[in-house]
């Protein structure tokens, strides 16, 4: 294999469009081996600076070769952001996260995490969304104007302020003049700016949602829609699509049918999230078949099924986790997560001609990458 590039056109396209950083001095994007060199150089410098630890030269080259040849893969968010972006905020190094929508700040935290390129799993189960404040009976136009700064932090802070004012009964104005125009180059994080229009759309969507919910609490579906709209805003900018999964109660009929019919025309933001029911105990056959029929009739294969009881049993089985947590999951649903936890994914690529020793070595190196 030519380590300068990847073996298939599809892999080359994904690398160039998602992970290769622009080299200004040479007016081109990185080749595959250069991307991994950047990742390895960053991690090596980070270990030395933060932990006074120098990677052994032999191990350094073993890790480099294994990644370049795709025997193992580190967190792909780290591969994408290694450099100034990851140095600025380690959130950008994690693949995924999970949080319940149980606090007004859940929405802006999800926005910030998504803008860092990290996937977000979230729950709109009633024991969480019922903790949110009640929307006032009336909403009044306020004189206050939210000035939105041109940064990930600025967008998230503006969203937090908008929600706080709406829950206090005020509809503010917002000033997006400081947000850079659409198409502007994002030098630190890579990609191009989405401009102010998506954020303006999000704010108007949230104001309308609050108006429709006056005098009561937001429903699970309304919380879900706001989270999905946040994801839609993030997908508009940069190069990383938002990855999201939404968990809901078995008895939540609104969420059961959230993605049926022509939802993609009427509520297009719902395309941003996979949806799954969160089982807390094994259902009887009638209950299971009712949900399964709904899944089949939706035409989208949703809602999927996440069994929290099995997650708790697995945590108890290995004795390394507190099994009493209400576990959630990441958007790919291959790992269980506690509320507000991140996921750091390393991968081992097993091939047909691998020996047991080959696989053991790959697992060892992948474990080092993820530690």
How should each PLM-predicted stretch be described?
Residues 1-371:
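Extended catalytic cores of very large enzyme megasubunits
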